[in-house]
Amino acid sequence: PVLVAARDPATGALGSVCRVMSGLKDEFYREFTTRMLGGEISDDRRPPGSRLLRAGPAPGVVTGETCKYWFNPEIIWEVKGADLSLSPVHKAAVGLVHAQRGISLRFPRFLRERPDKSVRDAATFAEVAERYRAQSNVSK
């Protein structure tokens, strides 16, 4: 799975929203691993030229997730999910809807990579909170 985040424009921090696995094919994982990590990972060794970070979370990323591999956020993905829910693990929009909980995308599915966008174009915490509040199942 790949951790996906939203952006806090006030601080530049990225808060996790979900882990995406659905919609990704084996071929995609191989290509993504080669592109981001510089080659296949074996025996937990860091390939030469790897973007892999030695420890996580990546700088500026706020999450309750524990990931085996971390790299600097630089790719924008378009994802779709069933709905948004409050989460003790994911940290996007903490304080905007609930004092301690972030907002998470349930049943996320990868749609496509967005090479035309940068991290500065990622969904903001305010946008995620607005989409959460707009759901019909959320009490107003």
Language model segments and positions:
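Intrinsically disordered, low-complexity regulatory tails
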Residues: 11-140
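Catalytic nucleophile-His microenvironment captured as a short glycine-rich beta-strand/loop
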Residues: 1-9
